Design a protein with these regions (language model features):
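Short cytosolic juxtamembrane segments of multi-pass membrane proteins
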Residues: 1-3, 258-265
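Membrane-water interface segments at the C-terminal ends of transmembrane alpha-helices
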Residues: 8-41, 54-159, 183, 187, ...
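Transmembrane helix boundary and interhelical loop/hinge segments in multi-pass membrane proteins
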Residues: 36, 46-49, 157-167, 176-178, ...
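Hydrophobic positions on the alpha-helical face of helix-turn-helix-like DNA-binding modules
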Residues: 168-169, 179, 183, 225
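Glycine/proline-centered hinge or cleavage motifs at structural transition points of membrane proteins
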Residues: 172-174, 186
Length: 265
């Protein structure tokens, strides 16, 4: 292949930096610099301060971060439960029925998240299940949006499982429930933790559907960031964005460590 040659490796490295720096690294560095600024009228910010981070650690900002963490935790656990159950059920179906189930779970990802938010709002704004104005409608919307990723991740892991493990357990007298709990789920644990981390990260950054549903006492951090930038407080909003990124990365690092330990068992 081209990248096996010395020139190919150099070209790949140059292409990576040419694409990575302006498209990914530079915008994040700009947000980081803006979070410490009080003024930005030239190439670099001036009037450096940590006041924006001090404000982010108290009051409304801290409550919004807590709300985002709790919402993401609840949504990722629900999505992992539903997605795993559906993937296990789909594994026993025929190809045609499995394709239908795949399409149903992918549908919320195929449409704009604001459409999902509107659908959840309409569905849960009337009895018998009246959740409009509560935190639970936000959790449900996030769960609907991220369950597809849990389902796809677990489905892919199930296809890679060696059936010899299950056959060996069954030959020793283990029933279906015991095979599931003692063989399949432990083998799936690395994929389950990866799916949970992905669902958590996606939920932490969700905004479009959340804007349609959140009640005043349950404001996630992305909504607060949008509100800050909308009223012109770009530097304060940048600090909140850095806090959101840091919290998400720390959670993903924790999940990665759990996944590594599970993979080495």
């Amino acid at each position: 292949m081209l990248v096996h040659s010395r020139k190919g490796r150099w070209a790949a490295a140059v292409l990576f930096f040419v694409l990575f720096l302006p498209l990914f690294a530079l915008p994040l560095l700009v947000i980081l610099a803006a979070s410490f600024a009080t003024n930005w009228s030239s190439v670099l910010p001036s009037g450096l301060t940590t006041a924006h981070y001090a404000a982010a650690a108290h009051g409304e900002a801290l409550q919004a971060l807590t709300t985002s963490l709790l919402t993401a935790l609840a949504a990722s656990l629900l999505a992992l439960t539903v997605g795993t159950w559906a993937a296990l059920a789909a594994a026993g179906l025929g190809r045609r029925h499995r394709a239908v189930l795949d399409a149903l779970f992918v549908l919320p990802v195929a449409v704009p998240s604001v459409v999902v938010g509107l659908a959840v709002l309409v569905a849960f704004s009337r009895p018998p299940v009246l959740l409009n104005g509560t935190r639970w409608i936000v959790v449900i919307a996030h769960t609907v949006l991220v369950t597809a990723f849990a389902y796809q991740s677990v489905s892919a892991a199930l296809r890679r499982l060696d059936p010899a493990y299950e056959q060996a357990a069954a030959s020793l007298g283990a029933g279906p429930a015991r095979v599931l709990w003692r063989v399949r789920l432990p083998l799936l644990l690395p994929s389950l933790t990866a799916a949970a981390g992905l669902c958590f990260a996606l939920s932490m950054g969700e905004l479009s559907a959340t804007m349609m549903l959140y009640p005043p006492d349950w404001t996630p951090l992305p909504v607060l960031i949008y509100a800050a930038t909308d009223r012109g407080s770009l530097f304060a909003g940048s600090a909140l964005a850095v806090v959101l990124m840091a919290a998400t990365l720390l959670a993903l690092l924790a999940v990665s460590r759990i996944r590594t330990r599970a993979a080495h068992r």
